[in-house]
Amino acid sequence: CIIRNCPRG
């Protein structure tokens, strides 16, 4: 993700 800190992508 760009807005949130996602574990992948």
From Swiss-Prot:
Lineage top rank: taxon: Eukaryota
Main subcellular location of this protein, as a coarse class: secreted
GO cellular component, one term: extracellular region
Name of this chain's protein: Conopressin-S
Annotated compartments: Secreted
Organism: Conus striatus
Disulphide connectivity of cysteines: C1-C6
Record GO terms (molecular function): neurohypophyseal hormone activity; toxin activity
Tissue specificity of this protein: Expressed by the venom duct.
Function field: Interacts with high affinity with vasopressin V1b receptor (AVPR1B) (Ki=8.3 nM), although the displacement of specific [3H]vasopressin binding is incomplete (a 30-40% resistant component remained). Has weaker affinity binding for oxytocin receptor (OXTR) (Ki=175 nM), and V1a receptor (AVPR1A) (Ki=827 nM).
PROSITE patterns noted in UniProt: NEUROHYPOPHYS_HORM
